[in-house]
């Protein structure tokens, strides 16, 4: 047994340095959640960063609010964050978490950047769930559903971004 507190501290720090790097970057990407999961007997595998950066999808979008009156009994997202209905966030079944997507309401042309931090929707025929605030900004909160197009802008901590196409930097 080591009696010197400085040596004990050095051993603990050394063990932490050896242990934590192995779990800090799943899949080799900072800030990227790639765990598979199951809901109602259906298994889902999140796509790779490379797949996500090329991902675009058109489908039916809905909005959800898992918080209750004044935020009491508010749930957590798949990333462990509190559900915040006033934030511009959303849920997708297989995109990496977190990631930022550009959502376009094809019914009125409104566009919004949304951070995905949750899984869902788990209702057939829907490709994206948004918070009430995001749905309001896109103009479909009253209707409940809208046809939208999503395009991934960045994945994880923001280091992995869609490459711009075009010969000028602003195109």
Locations of regions flagged by a protein language model:
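Sec-dependent bacterial lipoprotein signal peptides
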Residues: 1-22
